[in-house]
């Protein structure tokens, strides 16, 4: 079965652009890149020429005698004369380009030639994306795919755009959801927390209507990721990257979720592991949430590189790494146990990252003041609190009330509760997190009345 993705609309818009450049779709392994491109290709082109540099390494020779479009087309035709090139109606799809990054140099010449559309895809494991950038700057477009977000999960469940728009209207107008809406969406969101958004897992759940077999699929994905680390990481970094990856659930279970390299291995030091954390982030396997030096704008560059939290790029992978008893209890009884706070922080971090936000938090030294996340509007810095328990979001209210943080005027609290507003704090259900960026854009345009007139 094909799962509708947000990338579908992006690809259609890309094709309708008369000045389109070759496209590179990057992202972690097994998030649906190949399936999405194949679906788009078969519905939009008379001919599709697909080259997979992992499954068919013989095609790595197509750049041996040059990067010109005609040269590469000729070499592909020599290797397989059945592949047809129809000018103006052919998509050339280079898949798994991490196995042959040299192909990206050719994108400039395909752009200049203009006879064929080109899409590249790859996981970017073990290669320098900066090298690819330098080889194709000005002649390509980038797009990043991740696993399904909650909106795409709702699509898979059969909910249409009208349901999503109704959700968004509730947020903009600060109108609480009905009891039925809260029950339905909260239940669906908890299912999403357990399953995650990896297409194979979601598709299995949709086909069967149950969770049977999904844990096995999730754990196989973990094994595949661990194997990728062994395959692509080099030298002593291989063991270090695996240690960091495998230690994420343990560190998230702590009250203080800051990732501590010293707990990964005896004598471990950050300077030895810096590249390992960056490797995992670049691969898309994890999301890094960086500790701000001070809660003020701008966000970029305003952080301590030695302080960070690590979340999985897909929360379903976090679930898969729990022990059997915890994982079974979560599926059967929705009991999150000691992982409750970690689970909700993880799912919010994932939703924010998939919305295009970089992740930042703040912890004041020698103080209990700590804020889970920060986003921004055009003018203001906005703290985001994740409440797994009932509470008053004390740190957020301190940030809003204090004259020491003039760029913070209101905050957003995400919880299991309904929509509400009190003392400059807008409360919304967890399941609406994927709409937060859109809501703040509406605020910037004066179209979110509650945020424009917060209670004082």
Question: Residue spans of the language-model regions?
Answer:
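Interdomain motor-coupling "hinge/lid" segment immediately C-terminal to the ATP-binding subdomain
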Residues: 131-250
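N-terminal pre-Walker A segment at the start of P-loop NTPase domains
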Residues: 1-14
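Conserved lysine of the Walker
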Residues: 33
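Structural recognition of the conserved hydrophobic beta-strand(s) that form the central parallel beta-sheet
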Residues: 117-123, 144
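Accessory nucleic acid-recognition modules appended to NTPase machines
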Residues: 203-378
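Short glycine-rich substrate-engagement loop in P-loop NTPases that contacts/grips substrate
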Residues: 55-88
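Domain-level recognition of nuclease-like catalytic cores that cleave nucleotide substrates
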Residues: 418-456
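Hydrophobic positions on the alpha1 helix immediately C-terminal to the Walker A/P-loop
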Residues: 36, 40
């Amino acid at each position: 079965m094909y799962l509708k993705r947000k990338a579908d609309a992006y690809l259609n818009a890309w094709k309708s652009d008369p000045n389109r450049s070759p496209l590179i779709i990057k992202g972690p392994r097994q998030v649906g890149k190949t399936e999405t491109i194949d679906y788009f290709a078969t519905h939009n082109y008379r001919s599709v020429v697909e080259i997979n540099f992992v499954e068919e390494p013989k095609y790595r020779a197509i750049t041996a005698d040059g990067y010109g479009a005609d040269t590469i087309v000729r070499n592909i035709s020599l290797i397989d004369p059945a592949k047809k090139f129809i000018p103006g109606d052919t998509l050339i799809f280079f898949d798994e380009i991490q196995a042959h990054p040299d192909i990206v140099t050719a994108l400039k010449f395909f752009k200049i030639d203009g006879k064929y559309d080109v899409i590249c895809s790859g996981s970017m494991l073990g290669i320098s994306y900066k090298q690819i950038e330098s080889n194709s700057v000005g002649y390509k477009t980038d797009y990043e795919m991740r696993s399904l977000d909650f909106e795409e999960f709702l699509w898979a469940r059969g909910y249409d755009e009208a349901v999503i728009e109704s959700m968004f209207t509730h947020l903009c107008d600060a109108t609480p959801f009905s009891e039925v809406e809260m029950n339905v969406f909260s239940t669906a969101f908890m299912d999403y927390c357990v399953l995650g958004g990896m297409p194979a897992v979601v598709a299995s759940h949709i086909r069967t209507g149950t969770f049977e077999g999904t844990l096995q699929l999730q754990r196989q994905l973990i094994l595949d990721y661990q194997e990728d680390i062994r395959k692509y990481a080099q030298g002593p970094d291989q063991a270090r990257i695996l240690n960091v990856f495998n230690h994420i659930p343990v560190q998230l279970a702590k009250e203080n979720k800051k990732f501590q390299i010293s707990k990964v291995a005896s004598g471990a030091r950050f300077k030895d592991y810096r590249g390992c954390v960056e490797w995992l982030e670049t691969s898309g396997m994890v999301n890094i949430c960086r500790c701000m030096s001070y809660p003020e704008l701008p966000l970029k560059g305003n952080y301590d590189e030695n302080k960070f939290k690590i979340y999985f790029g897909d929360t379903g992978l976090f679930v898969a790494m729990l022990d059997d008893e915890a994982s079974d209890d979560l599926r059967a009884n929705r009991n999150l146990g000691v992982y409750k706070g970690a689970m909700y922080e993880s799912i919010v971090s994932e939703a924010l990252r998939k919305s295009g936000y970089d992740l930042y938090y703040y912890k004041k030294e020698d103080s209990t003041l700590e804020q889970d996340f920060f986003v921004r509007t055009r003018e203001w810095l906005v703290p985001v609190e994740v409440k797994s328990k009932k509470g008053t979001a004390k740190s957020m209210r301190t940030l809003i009330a204090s004259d020491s943080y003039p760029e913070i005027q209101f905050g957003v609290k995400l919880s299991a509760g309904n929509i509400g507003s009190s003392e400059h704090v807008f409360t919304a259900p967890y399941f609406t997190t994927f709409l937060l960026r859109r809501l703040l854009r509406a605020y910037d345009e004066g179209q979110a009345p509650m945020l424009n007139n917060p209670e004082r």
